[in-house]
Amino acid sequence: MKTLLLLLLVLLELGEAQGSLHRVPLRRHPSLKKKLRARSQLSEFWKSHNLDMIQFTESCSMDQSAKEPLINYLDMEYFGTISIGSPPQNFTVIFDTGSSNLWVPSVYCTSPACKTHSRFQPSQSSTYSQPGQSFSIQYGTGSLSGIIGADQVSVEGLTVVGQQFGESVTEPGQTFVDAEFDGILGLGYPSLAVGGVTPVFDNMMAQNLVDLPMFSVYMSSNPEGGAGSELIFGGYDHSHFSGSLNWVPVTKQAYWQIALDNIQVGGTVMFCSEGCQAIVDTGTSLITGPSDKIKQLQNAIGAAPVDGEYAVECANLNVMPDVTFTINGVPYTLSPTAYTLLDFVDGMQFCSSGFQGLDIHPPAGPLWILGDVFIRQFYSVFDRGNNRVGLAPAVP
């Protein structure tokens, strides 16, 4: 009888997970930082943006100006494709759980970054309309601004009608010029959306395009294009993780924010001994935390400043400590190979730390951000129906 009951529970969970799954392939490209480093331009980039990544801090606030740390996108490697309009115009985007707006470059944008990317042409779409509202997103090096348009947005067979989105007319700095992506599709809660725009996933749910009010993310560790990486709308795929999902309640419905019990380095609690807050963020490449804490963490793993960032000796990976995030009573351990980014410069190995200081001040912070370095190791499910995040060890 007990065996039958367990089987029924497993079947129920499988049914909940599957529904009708809509899979969005995520392609992995070399990050902007890797490209700049390969061209020996990384130091010049830091200087031109007045950035010292060793001391980097940035004040973030959750007001209508929606401050975003631009530096988060430097290491982004996973991108997908969407289309806007009739007939469809294709764009490469970051699917970002740390923001809630969709924006792409406008054909009317004259910033250098727009000239190197796909631009939306409203006059070419028969389903386009313009509400007439402006928008602005503040980044560390300036503001991205433009107008809000409305059109149908398609993502791998899911077509949202009447989706409002930003058409950028100005884009800040040099960062977006060399970026692999055209725009960003935010998957955060509506409270984060600039201009009161309804996010894409909320419209998917409202228009009954997904069977289940959840989506999931698998980021392959395969450096050759990240084969198999995908975003799933409407459920999750058991083949992408081992064991069972551990569900963690969302503590604040803006980012996908959860509570951390503690953070251990080498088996010893070093941070958050009385708990702290974190967000699971597909739009941040590294793991970030308060700058003073991250400095201690870099010292603990043996990372040292090199050319404006923290690096470790590649030969020391086998003796460096594990870093463990305890969440809802469950330990999530990152080995040194998991939290270290490997690159090649002039044929030589270069290993940089996957941790970055970022100060997010009240009322939004302080926050730790569990970005792609974490998500590559732990399959992540974002459940809007129950306001929770599911985590389990990812299958390589």
From Swiss-Prot:
Gene of this entry: CTSE
A Gene Ontology molecular function term of the record: peptidase activity
Disulfide bonds: C109-C114, C272-C276, C314-C351
Cell location: Endosome
PANTHER family with a match to the protein in the record: BETA-SITE APP-CLEAVING ENZYME, ISOFORM A-RELATED (PTHR47966), CATHEPSIN E (PTHR47966:SF26)
Protein source organism: Homo sapiens
Oligomeric and partner information: Homodimer; disulfide-linked.
Record's function text: May have a role in immune function. Probably involved in the processing of antigenic peptides during MHC class II-mediated antigen presentation. May play a role in activation-induced lymphocyte depletion in the thymus, and in neuronal degeneration and glial cell activation in the brain.
EC number(s) reported in the record: 3.4.23.34
Acetylation among keywords: no
Any one GO CC term of the record: intracellular membrane-bounded organelle
Catalytic activity: Similar to cathepsin D, but slightly broader specificity
Top-rank taxon: Eukaryota
Post-translational modification summary for this protein: Glycosylated. The nature of the carbohydrate chain varies between cell types. In fibroblasts, the proenzyme contains a high mannose-type oligosaccharide, while the mature enzyme contains a complex-type oligosaccharide. In erythrocyte membranes, both the proenzyme and mature enzyme contain a complex-type oligosaccharide.
Domain Peptidase A1: from-to ranges: 78-396
Protein name: Cathepsin E
Annotated glycosylation sites: N90
Keyword Lipid metabolism: no
Tissues with expression: Expressed abundantly in the stomach, the Clara cells of the lung and activated B-lymphocytes, and at lower levels in lymph nodes, skin and spleen. Not expressed in resting B-lymphocytes.
CDD domains: Cathespin_E (cd05486)
InterPro entries assigned: Aspartic_peptidase_A1, Aspartic_peptidase_AS, Aspartic_peptidase_N, PEPTIDASE_A1, Peptidase_aspartic_dom_sf
Family named by the database record: Belongs to the peptidase A1 family.
Major location category of this protein: other
